[in-house]
Design a protein with these regions (language model features):
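Composition-driven detection of intrinsically disordered, low-complexity segments
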Residues: 13-14, 225
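N-terminal secretory signal peptides that target proteins for export/translocation
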Residues: 1-13
């Protein structure tokens, strides 16, 4: 187990690496700030300063969240920790399946340990009871409930829905495990078979109530949720997986319908022109597993960029928004920024700076072309998970947040979920605590915020998760059916790079 306090290690080499990284970051940052509206002019290929010791430490701590908390008979990952509500997030399980292999490649656990934990996970989901009954089931028609009881693995409560997007995040981890564990070994062969069965069972057309769009979910008490996934957001992964299905695929017209309203979200915000979605998780989740560099669908071909560059611009725009700080929140600046879905202090309207301001507990927060909700709450995952897109602004931000707030926000499993320097009111809180001179700080780590941290650091280092998923035939098929062309899709499946035993 790693220590609870991060300390920079002395030595000429570490100082030299850190100095080089900082120098490069400053040069690239200056170039970034000179970018004309609608462009981020620094070539992405140049933006690769080496990881500093903090990122190495953060990657391991965040991996440990998944490894430590899933050590149970069904290997389910809790939605959050140490909050004592006993439920698992199926999306967090998908991130966990990805994190275990990262732990192998980094030398923190053995391949056998990761294989066995992954096999336990897949055995559970392959055999978990499904059906329309309101209790005692883990899902229906191949989809799974958003939250499951940690012990029984069945639906957590009557308000929990069968979720298309959370099932997709779980499946991304399942397919990652299927592709990573590729050896001639009985246990690894079983992982591949179980992954196929879990993915093939999902009846995607069942949730196409208003075809060709895919609905958000279903509840046994009230039926289908009256909302569909359309326009740019985190559900890009849902459509790619549904198009790639070998058993229950959706039609090609679904991607056309999904992108039909993109123009409403396209525009300029904070000196960047891009396809907007306020919270940064919408620009990150699908990118955890899919390498969008150099591949484009029809819409992005017409716009002249790819989704990776789009996420880069969204990241830069969020930082620019924090520098502008139109709502005058405390702490915001060039190296303290990041709005996404996260915990917050509480749900209330309170006086701040002579104005009534809305604060929220857990909520999506963001700033973009069409939507802004900002209550002063910063989530470190928002910046860290954008590391591959814009390292020249992410690295200084992560270093500054850890340096400025230290152990109050950085602990056993890395960054606590969020903090709000502006919220220092003396009142009862649902979660978190008030720290003098700092403000509100979350008390929990949240699985779906931890997952992008560990995965995107790995992708930044050497493209590990992306390289594995490039070899998955279902991902490739889904992208091709969505009309993606170019880049690695034109190269054909690549052989696997060397791996640890």
């Amino acid at each position: 187990m790693i220590a609870a306090t991060y300390t920079k290690k002395p030595g000429a080499l570490s100082r030299a690496v850190a100095c080089c990284a900082l120098l490069l970051a400053l040069v690239l940052l200056a170039a970034c700030e000179r970018s004309p509206p609608g462009a981020s002019e620094v070539p992405v290929a140049l933006l690769h300063p080496p990881l500093t010791p903090l990122f190495v430490d953060l990657e391991e701590r965040t991996f440990r969240y998944f490894w430590d908390t899933s050590d149970r008979p069904n290997a389910l990952v809790p939605d959050r920790f140490p909050y004592n509500e006993p439920f698992s997030s199926i999306a967090a399980v998908g991130f966990g399946l990805t994190a275990y292999a990262i732990g192998v490649e980094r030398g923190w656990i053995t391949r056998q340990q990761a294989r066995d934990r992954s096999l336990t996970t897949l055995r559970f989901f392959a055999t978990a009871p499904q059906g329309p009954e309101p209790s005692g089931k883990a899902g229906h028609n191949g989809f799974f409930y958003h939250f499951l009881q940690l012990d029984s693995g069945t639906r957590y409560a009557s308000w929990v829905e069968v979720s298309s997007v959370d099932t997709a995040l779980l499946l991304a981890g399942v397919l990652f495990a299927q592709t990573y564990y590729d050896r001639d070994d009985p246990a690894e062969a079983e992982i591949r078979i179980l992954a196929d069965a879990i993915y093939a069972r999902v009846d995607w057309p069942w949730l196409q109530v208003r075809k060709p769009l895919i609905g958000m979910g279903w509840l046994p008490e009230s039926g289908f949720i009256p909302h569909d996934w359309q326009g740019y957001n985190e559900a890009m992964l849902v459509y790619i997986l549904a198009l790639g299905s070998p058993t229950h695929p959706i039609g090609d017209d679904a991607w056309v319908a999904w992108t039909r309203n993109y123009d409403h979200a396209w525009g300029q915000f904070q000196q960047q022109e891009y396809l907007g979605f306020g919270p940064l998780f919408g620009h990150q989740y699908s990118h955890v597993w899919i390498d969008f560099r150099g591949i484009r669908d029809d819409y992005m071909r017409r716009r002249g960029l790819d989704y990776f560059e789009n996420s880069r611009r969204a990241t830069i725009a969020q930082r620019n928004y924090a520098i502008a700080n139109p709502m005058r929140w405390k702490g915001y600046g060039e190296n303290v920024w990041g709005l996404t879905a996260s915990d917050g202090p509480l749900a209330a309207s309170l006086d701040y700076d002579g104005q009534s301001r809305e604060f929220r507990h857990y909520s999506a927060r963001g700033a973009g072309i069409a939507d802004v909700f900002d209550d002063g709450t910063i989530a470190p995952t928002a910046a860290v998970a954008s590391l591959p897109f814009a390292p020249e602004i992410v690295m200084p931000a992560v270093e500054e947040m850890q340096h400025r707030y230290g152990d109050e926000i950085y602990g056993k499993y890395g960054f606590l979920d969020a903090f709000n320097p502006s919220f220092d009111y003396d009142m009862p809180l649902k979660t978190g605590r008030i720290v003098p001179e700092l403000g509100w700080v979350a008390s929990d780590y949240i699985g779906i915020d931890q997952g992008p941290i560990v995965a995107m650091i790995a992708n930044y280092r050497d493209g590990f998760v992306w390289d594995v998923m490039r070899r998955n035939p279902y991902i490739r098929r889904g992208l091709l059916r969505a009309g993606f062309q170019g880049g690695w899709l034109e190269e054909g499946p690549q052989p696997r790079k060397g791996a640890r035993p």
